[in-house]
Amino acid sequence: MKIYIAPMAGITDYAFRSILKEFNPDLIFTEMVNANLVNMNDVNTFNTLLKRDGDESVQVFGSGKERLVDAFLKLESIGIKHLELNMGCPKTKIIKTGAGSALLPEKENMTDLLETLRSQLSDNTE
């Protein structure tokens, strides 16, 4: 059985992830990252992302194909090798922005987005 530690906003910060690593999970996620903040080169977002041991996964939330693709490419360019798109967050403040589970009804758009991500990201990025 594989053990993945899911992203938890306000909880899975660097210190918490360091403690969790003692239990040898197969994969640990950073806190969810806003695609818009990644694209704006937000200092706090990048400080969070760069303060990691290198093998953590990053889960991105956002809406809009171009914004999401740009964010994924930027994250890949700073060495993040495991990326995940959040399509399940039910929180109202996330859904209001068209992100999280608000993406689910848009099957055609999501298929196009995922195909674009697959074609533009390196084969080394999971």
Show the residue positions of the predicted features.
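Extreme N-terminal starter segment of soluble prokaryotic enzymes
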Residues: M1-Y4
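Glycine-rich, positively charged N-terminal anion/phosphate-binding segment
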Residues: M8-I78
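Gly/Ser/Thr-rich beta-alpha loop segments that engage phosphate groups in nucleotides
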Residues: T12, G64, P90, G100-A102
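Hydrophobic "anchor" residues on beta-strands that sit immediately upstream
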Residues: L27, H82, E126
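Non-cysteine beta-strand/loop elements that form the S-adenosyl-L-methionine
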Residues: T30, H82-P90
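Alpha-helix-loop-beta-strand connector modules within alpha/beta enzyme cores
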Residues: F46-Q59, S101-E126
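Short, charged beta->alpha transition segments
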Residues: A71-I78, H82-L83, D112-L117
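Short acidic, glycine/proline-rich loop/turn micro-motifs
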Residues: I95-A99
